[in-house]
């Protein structure tokens, strides 16, 4: 695509858009909020698919186990939101992370995204929101390089460029090879950095209780799941939680910069030692550098509290 179209595709889209969500839904308590937020914004999103991403931490025995648990969590959330009609659009993702930067990991999710992308164009792109390790998306790109023309990727991953060890953030460090594919291929990319930016998107038990409890089954689940997780390490103590992943969905709703501020920067280069390298001649990406916490939580809580 030409430069004018490329920069347009790095701008918040107008009107209703087709979107795929790629999520490690069981990894944390925030993916569930992001999924719910997307499901409740039907006036903006035509959800083409929800893909389960791999993860490995204390909640999974291996990347494959994390992906399977995320797949089941996605289906649970669709049931709670009374949107079971979307179950046929849920896809299992990669069972392992990339072994190198040239070889795709085969999965339903990667095959689905690679094939779907051919239905789009630079003038009418497919939006892919990724909120976990970016293995599925990188694999799809390796399978179908034309995605760089036909898609836009919005990813919550990495830390702020001003921070040390910025490439050591959880989503990014699990699959640096995948991150290097996505940051290096030239696809229009919007980065929501975690440390130093999105970590300001905090909420507390009492705020969640006020805005969510008793509204609907999805809201009750989000509240109980978050409190249970926090009480597992901070019972009887004050705590807050960052609802990280909501911000990636919210970028697509960020008309007039109401939820966040952004700028163009040359695409950073994630390195295997946990740092970024920088080259001012690289292609531009959109980089979010500030979150309007109160404005976004107001919209999130109001949307989640709707009956469906």
Question: What do the predicted segments below correspond to?
Answer:
Residues 1-308:
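N-terminal acidic, glycine/proline-rich low-complexity segments
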């Amino acid at each position: 695509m030409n430069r004018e179209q490329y920069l347009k595709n790095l701008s918040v889209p107008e009107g209703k858009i087709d979107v795929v969500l790629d999520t490690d839904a069981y990894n944390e308590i925030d993916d569930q909020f992001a999924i719910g937020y997307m499901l409740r914004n039907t006036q903006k999103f035509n959800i083409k698919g929800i893909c389960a991403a791999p993860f490995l931490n204390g909640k999974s025995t291996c990347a494959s186990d994390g992906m399977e648990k995320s797949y089941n969590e996605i289906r649970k959330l669709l049931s709670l939101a009374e949107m079971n009609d979307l179950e046929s659009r849920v896809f299992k993702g990669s069972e392992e992370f990339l072994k190198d930067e040239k070889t795709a990991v085969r999965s339903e999710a990667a095959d689905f995204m690679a094939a779907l992308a051919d239905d789009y164009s630079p003038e009418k792109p497919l939006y892919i929101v990724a909120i976990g390790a970016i293995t599925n998306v990188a694999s799809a790109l390796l399978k179908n390089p034309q995605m760089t023309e036909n898609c836009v990727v919005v990813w919550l991953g990495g830390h702020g460029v001003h921070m040390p060890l910025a490439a050591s953030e959880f989503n990014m460090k699990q699959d640096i090879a995948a991150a290097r594919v996505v940051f290096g291929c030239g696809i229009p990319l919007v980065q929501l950095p975690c440390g130093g930016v999105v970590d300001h998107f905090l909420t507390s038990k009492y705020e969640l209780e006020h805005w969510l409890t008793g509204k609907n089954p999805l809201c009750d689940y989000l509240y109980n799941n978050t409190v249970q997780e926090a009480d597992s390490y901070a019972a009887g103590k004050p705590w807050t939680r960052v609802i990280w992943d909501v911000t990636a969905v919210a970028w697509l709703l960020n008309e007039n910069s109401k939820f966040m501020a952004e700028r163009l920067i040359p695409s950073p280069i994630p390195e295997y030692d946990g740092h970024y390298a920088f080259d001012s001649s690289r292609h531009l990406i959109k980089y979010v550098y500030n979150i309007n916490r109160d404005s976004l939580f107001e919209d999130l809580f109001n949307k989640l509290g709707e009956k469906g």
